[in-house]
Amino acid sequence: MLMLLVRGTHYESLRSKVVLPTPLGGRGTEALVSECPSPDTGIRWRQSDEALRVNVGGVRRLLSARALARFPGTRLGRLQAAASEEQARRLCDDYDAAAREFYFDRHPGFFLGLLHFYRTGHLHVLDELCVFAFGQEADYWGLGENALAACCRARYLERRLSQPRAWDEDSDTPSSVDPCPDEISDVQRELARYGAARCGRLRRRLWLTMENPGYSLPSKLFSCVSISVVLASIAAMCIHSLPEYQAREAAAAVAAVAAGRSPEGVRDDPVLRRLEYFCIAWFSFEVSSRLLLAPSTRNFFCHPLNLIDIVSVLPFYLTLLAGVALGDQGGTGGKELGHLGKVVQVFRLMRIFRVLKLARHSTGLRSLGATLKHSYREVGILLLYLAVGVSVFSGVAYTAEKEEDVGFNTIPACWWWGTVSMTTVGYGDVVPVTVAGKLAASGCILGGILVVALPITIIFNKFSHFYRRQKALEAAVRNSNHQEFEDLLSSVDGVSEASLETSRETSQEGRSADLETQAPSEPPHPQMY
């Protein structure tokens, strides 16, 4: 243990550093211990043996210089060894020069445990703090894992490892099912944009009605109508593929071509065509309304659900543009009509993406999208495992079955068999007949079970996490009082970004009041440690 402060002793000008052990918060720190002035610098701003008066969250205590000198690498030890007031201010949140008191806006309960650490040299875990908050406090005060008492160290490490972390490995924020405060801040920031907009209150109500099904009764009705239109569009697309509709439309198309007319006007059944036009009109109304009511146009085009809405109506308008383009060229021959038919078929195939519009009204689909977004590493590992297994077992099967003429003619042809075998699908269209081939197939199936099961468990756990989190958000909206929500909306009327910054500054004014008034629960004079 370094003894940097000795009563009545002068040091030469030096600047020493103490490398602290790995803090409980998980980051390594290199702490500046002291800057002792040279003998000719004059009188110090405070005596080296003067007791340190601190105020941590309203708890006032006096700490002796000798107790702090035992642990010079901690924040209070460095504060005691500070060579100037400017250096000391960098270590605390505020300083009252008249009372010579240092203020820290930290957890007062942890500070009481910190006082016990300065007396005994051991830090005990507080049950009132979660392991992550405890680690952050310990990191702030400059305590390492070695400071933990032996009776609490194993329990602390076990609790820290058992707590779920954020699914995004790039984030340091602990995982939680509860709504994140940042999400609430983002919503308030978006709603604040309506304060300076024209007809902002009306636009805000319409936006919330279209975006939040649980906001009001009209929003629930709008959601039901939107879901019904999506299901009707999908049903019409499925009915259009039935054989009786295909035969009737093919005959009408042949008759139209023979008469020198475009077959596109007669291919669709009149009822299905009218239903398609109605669905397109509704989808177009949804997209345009959301675009006009959105608080931010840039954020609108960055949202995945809005992109799905655009893709759901894009094929219809592209088909119209293709027909107009060929019509302007005056092409009525079979070649131009054939090209138009291929373009229309491709665009009609894109209508299948309309099923993704249900994600706006489905908690499970949104949770699935969030799971895939945060599981790209696991999905990549799964594909890598499958690729390696398919390549190995396909080569073995080709070697064993190439002479039997049962479909294993080339290694690329064996890839299909290896894929359906490793995924335990087993279509049975290609099967091995030799003993060596059957052994290879058995190994392929068993390897597929083991390989697929490993990352699937992690992905399923992430899906469960995001699903519970999404349900918690929806429950918070449903169970909240409607009048309270209206008060929240009214509070952001006329609010700008500058006013939000002003409110943050105002919220910090209470810190100086703590320095002037003493908490009623505290004794008249700080206790000495």
UniProtKB/Swiss-Prot annotation:
Bias (Basic and acidic residues): 502-514
GO molecular function annotation: delayed rectifier potassium channel activity; potassium channel regulator activity
Coiled coil (UniProt feature): none
Region (Disordered): 494-529
Intramembrane intervals: 412-423, 424-431
Transmembrane segments: 218-239, 271-293, 305-322, 341-361, 377-398, 439-467
InterPro entries recorded: BTB/POZ_dom, Ion_trans_dom, K_chnl_volt-dep_Kv, K_chnl_volt-dep_Kv5/Kv9, SKP1/BTB/POZ_sf, T1-type_BTB, VG_K_chnl, Volt_channel_dom_sf
GO terms for biological process, alphabetical: action potential; potassium ion transport; protein homooligomerization; regulation of potassium ion transmembrane transport
UniProt GO cellular component terms: perinuclear region of cytoplasm; plasma membrane; voltage-gated potassium channel complex
UniProt main location, coarse: membrane
Subcellular location field: Cell membrane
Motif (Selectivity filter): 424-429
Segments on the Extracellular side according to the record's topology features: 240-270, 323-340, 399-411, 432-438
Xref: Gene3D superfamilies: 1.10.287.70, Potassium Channel Kv1.1, Chain A, Voltage-gated potassium channels. Chain C
UniProtKB keywords: Cell membrane, Ion channel, Ion transport, Membrane, Potassium, Potassium channel, Potassium transport, Transmembrane, Transmembrane helix, Transport, Voltage-gated channel
Superkingdom, taxonomy of origin: Eukaryota
Residue numbers on the Cytoplasmic membrane side: 1-217, 294-304, 362-376, 468-529
Membrane topology reported for the UniProt record: Multi-pass membrane protein
Subunit relationships: Heterotetramer with KCNB1. Heterotetramer with KCNB2. Does not form homomultimers.
Stated family: Belongs to the potassium channel family. S (TC 1.A.1.2) subfamily. Kv9.1/KCNS1 sub-subfamily.
Domain comment as written in the entry: The transmembrane segment S4 functions as a voltage-sensor and is characterized by a series of positively charged amino acids at every third position. Channel opening and closing is effected by a conformation change that affects the position and orientation of the voltage-sensor paddle formed by S3 and S4 within the membrane. A transmembrane electric field that is positive inside would push the positively charged S4 segment outwards, thereby opening the pore, while a field that is negative inside would pull the S4 segment inwards and close the pore.
Protein role: Potassium channel regulatory subunit that modulate the delayed rectifier voltage-gated potassium channel activity of KCNB1 and KCNB2 by altering their kinetics, expression levels, and shifting the half-inactivation potential to more polarized values. While it does not form functional channels on its own, it can form functional heterotetrameric channels with KCNB1 and KCNB2. Each regulatory subunit has unique regulatory properties that can lead to extensive inhibition, significant changes in kinetics, and/or substantial shifts in the voltage dependencies of the inactivation process.
Protein name in UniProt: Delayed-rectifier potassium channel regulatory subunit KCNS1
Provenance organism: Chlorocebus aethiops
